[in-house]
Amino acid sequence: MQERDILLKIKEIAKAKNFKTELDESVLQKPFRELKIDSLDMFSVIVSLEKEFDIMFEDEKLMQLNNLAELIAEVKHLISQKGV
């Protein structure tokens, strides 16, 4: 799966959950806190991504995710590990 496809899915989730910030390529490196995305918002995105892609984030790894680019990279990694 390509990063762009993952970003599109995250954008769909954010829109469905009425996020105030538009999540697109222009904000990939901005910290979540600058985007006004709090822990509850992140939790809902993570749960939706786990269901959508049949993946499971490790709690320790979640604590290290600081921006959208890192989240996309981790989703891509977890998807690639499913076939192993």
Curated annotation (Swiss-Prot):
Pfam families: PP-binding. 4'-phosphopantetheine is transferred from CoA to a specific serine of the apo-ACP-like protein. PROSITE patterns: CARRIER (PS50075). Carrier of the growing fatty acid chain in fatty acid biosynthesis. Gene3D superfamilies: ACP-like. It comes from Mycoplasma pneumoniae (strain ATCC 29342 / M129 / Subtype 1). It comes from the Bacteria. InterPro entries: ACP-like_sf, PP-bd_ACP. Pathway: Lipid metabolism; fatty acid biosynthesis. Residues 4-79 form the Carrier domain. This is Acyl carrier protein homolog.
